[in-house]
């Protein structure tokens, strides 16, 4: 390995693990915040459970990604077949949970916001139950499409083999036949189009409701809207930003995946795809925390308690 390649690998390693570090810290804060709010007995919002769940999923997924990617920089492979299959399949499994939970969150928020005259209003009472069943079903379906990893993932024995698609120094994918590749490509395309399309529709629906709400508020007040947003509007904007960010990341990830298939697992494309694929898991909790006004109230309350304790002890 020459000096330029060494510098490139070092810079890439620092950049990727910085992203992973930010993601782990942000998801841990978001998960602890929702846990603490639940322990304190605050009345939870209907979207708190899906957001807390996706924070936990992203936390585990990023830890797995860090462990798998560390093997990418090892001087020699050290995993066996079982380890490769286990870690790569678990990573894909938690990615599927992330996508399905994000889709469930967008649909759930759209159902909550729909007016009573809408056909979606009849799902309001039973929406948590229905969406939980939908989440479980889609997670199983999403993961089953990636079940071929249990067969295709193997420990890399010879780095000079031209038939393998390299994932890390220790793990590779066996090449698939053209018929199997077409089958899995069709299933993957159907899966992505369905989930991303569902999220896109629910996002557009929420944006439409938000615009209508602003228009009606302006008509009632006969003036410009107050710059202070209501909690409901902040919740809508948070979900809209999450969905928009997810759709952008998913589009880039799909393009990179397709490009890797065309160019037979090019390593440079894989190096670009890794941080792109984990961008949503790493930075989405920052969007939620930035728009979470309850966090500010919680921090002020904790600060007041610390000040009181210090005054009592002194």
Swiss-Prot record:
Organism (species): Rattus norvegicus
Name by which UniProt lists this protein: Vomeronasal type-1 receptor 95
Disulfide-bonded cysteines: 84-171
GO molecular function terms attached to this record: pheromone receptor activity
Gene Ontology BP term (one): response to pheromone
Keyword Magnesium: no
Keywords: Cell membrane, Disulfide bond, G-protein coupled receptor, Glycoprotein, Membrane, Pheromone response, Receptor, Transducer, Transmembrane, Transmembrane helix
Residues the record marks as carrying a glycan: 158, 266
Top-level taxon of origin: Eukaryota
Location(s), subcellular: Cell membrane
Stretches in topological domain Extracellular: 1-18, 70-88, 155-186, 257-268
UniProt membrane topology term: Multi-pass membrane protein
Name of the coding gene: Vom1r95
Keyword flag Transmembrane helix: yes
InterPro entries: Vmron_rcpt_1
Residue ranges of the TM segments: 19-39, 49-69, 89-113, 134-154, 187-207, 236-256, 269-289
A single Gene Ontology CC term: plasma membrane
Record-stated family: Belongs to the G-protein coupled receptor 1 family.
Gene3D superfamilies xrefs: Rhodopsin 7-helix transmembrane proteins (1.20.1070.10)
Function: Putative pheromone receptor implicated in the regulation of social as well as reproductive behavior.
Classification via CDD domains: 7tm_V1R_pheromone
Cytoplasmic side: 40-48, 114-133, 208-235, 290-314
Pfam families: V1R (PF03402)
């Amino acid at each position: 390995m020459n000096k330029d390649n060494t510098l490139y690998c070092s810079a890439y390693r620092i950049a990727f693990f910085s992203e992973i570090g930010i993601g782990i810290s942000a998801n841990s804060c978001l998960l602890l915040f929702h846990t603490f709010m639940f322990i304190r007995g605050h009345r939870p919002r209907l979207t708190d459970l899906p957001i807390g769940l996706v924070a936990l999923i992203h936390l585990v997924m990023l830890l797995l990604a860090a462990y798998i990617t560390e093997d990418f920089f090892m001087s020699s492979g050290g995993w066996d077949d079982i380890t490769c299959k286990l870690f790569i399949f678990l990573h894909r499994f938690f990615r599927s949970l992330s996508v399905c939970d994000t889709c469930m969150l967008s649909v759930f928020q759209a159902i909550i916001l729909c007016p009573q005259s809408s056909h979606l209003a009849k799902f309001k009472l039973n929406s948590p139950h229905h969406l939980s069943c939908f989440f479980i079903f889609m997670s199983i379906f999403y993961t089953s499409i990636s079940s071929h990893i249990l067969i295709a993932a193997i420990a890399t024995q010879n780095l000079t083999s031209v038939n393998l698609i390299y994932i890390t120094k220790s793990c590779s994918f066996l090449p698939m036949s053209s018929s199997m590749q077409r089958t899995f490509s069709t299933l993957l395309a159907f899966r992505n189009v369905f989930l991303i399309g569902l999220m896109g529709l629910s996002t557009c629906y929420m944006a439409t409701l938000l615009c209508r709400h602003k228009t009606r508020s302006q008509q009632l007040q006969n003036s410009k809207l107050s710059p202070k947003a209501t909690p409901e509007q902040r919740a809508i904007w948070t979900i809209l930003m999450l969905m928009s960010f997810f759709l952008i990341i998913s589009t880039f990830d799909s393009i990179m995946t397709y490009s890797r298939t065309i160019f037979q697992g090019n390593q440079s494309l894989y190096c670009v795809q890794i941080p792109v694929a984990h961008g949503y898991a790493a930075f989405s909790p920052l969007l939620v925390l930035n728009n979470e006004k309850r966090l500010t109230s919680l921090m002020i309350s904790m600060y007041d308690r610390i000040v009181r304790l210090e005054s009592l002890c002194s």
